[in-house]
Amino acid sequence: MKDLSLTLENLDEAFPSEFTQEQLAKAKTIFLKKLSEDAHCFYQGKIQTVAKAPVVGFNWFNVWYTPGVSKVSTKIRDNNDCSFELSNRGNLVAVVSDSTRVLGDGDCTPPGGLGVMEGKAFLMKYLGGVDGVALCIDSRDKDGRHNPDKIIDFVKMCQYSFGAVNLEDISQPNCFKVLDVLREECEIPVWHDDAQGTACVTLAGVINALKLAGKKISDVRIVLYGAGASNTTIARLLITDGADPAKMVLFDTKGALHSGRDDIKADARFYRKWELCEHTNPTHILTMDDAMKGADILISLSTPGPDVIKGEWVKSMADRSIVFACANPVPEIYPYAAKEAGAYIVATGRGDFPNQVNNSIGFPGILKGALMVRARKITDNMAIAAAHSLAEYAEKRGIHIDDIVPNMEEAAVFPYEAADVAMQAIADGVARVTLTREEAFQKAKKDIEHARCLTRSLMDKGFIDMPPADMIRKALDFAIGQVKG
């Protein structure tokens, strides 16, 4: 055991050396949850409002507020597009959730999603130079049922204060209707990160994993375990980017998706799943045992693990198999177990394991790119462009089986990705503003550097306290004690 650094970079070495791989994985999960709870309590959340304009003297309040600000109001009244230039709207994202599917914890009640939504805004700012506001709402109707129309109405009413909307942690099937309606009826881009963001980064991982495995996307057999918002969107983007739907099988809680699933066909709310029933699994494979035999890729976004994905399934896969076990907060199978079962490349959604396939490397750059050109929507082409941008960036700096996509520490990836997304928005005809790629790249780079410098300055000057070492030590001791029993 070594002393744990404040950066947590030597976390594995801070646990007893006699811990097995399984004990270590369990201990890290317990530690991170305990430290998260204590740190959130210590800081009282993660986000605050900081002024971006100077207070040269109190007379300037007559400029920033009344009477001077009246001119701003009337100018926006006469041309609503001026709101993007005369306010922070052009760089502001609403992070909207009804908290009905928070990570793997289910319905956490409206305020229960605040930790995740603030976290989203936190990452947007530091990684993408984008301001975010957490908005957790109650979507229940008078009968107590969660009604997607309540979310739709809320977003449509508040869209005029924001440059984009990030939907988060909305349970299915409501999430499908909410996204599809808002994408068409809002004047600003609406992005569902659980679906589109996860799909974008997963596609990036698949692109580079296939390069390392020496396989083509059009040739491989793909199994998707779980058929929620994430995996259904992943399937759609994979097919759009060249995967063969006839070589693809998806599973939900009732079994494999295929054209004989009358239960899905009969429920109009699950129209996205039915589309996949019609186009995938033409031979009506019914079981995971059969689907996994000879499969090249497994993408699992289902129930938090471990032991949700069986080692026997992985053993039956093709040579140089690829396993993405991306449930949060615990993957369906731990990486060490998947490797022991013969997987060539393993990815999870967690940053403390190799190959973090997590939307944290996607949404900051994607939203920044959309905002810079004032896009009206984020198209599937823009998401696919972001995936290829991430894969290309990683390949240029070098990839290997434990490093297939960029990570959050690679600051340069975000302006690179943002610029590619902006260019695709222009190509798709959804941009209000035209920039060159270099202009987009430089603007994103400047804004991201500014956001990081601001945070570091607040830390250096003591306006943001460092985490107490004792708090970290207590969380570590707690985790070790829980595992040792």
Predicted regions and their residues:
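Solvent-exposed alpha-helices and their adjacent loops that cap or buttress functional pockets
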Residues: S83-R89, K125-L127, M157-Q159, R183-E184, ...
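Glycine-rich phosphate/diphosphate-binding loop of Rossmann-like nucleotide-binding domains
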Residues: L103, P111-G128, H192, C200-T303
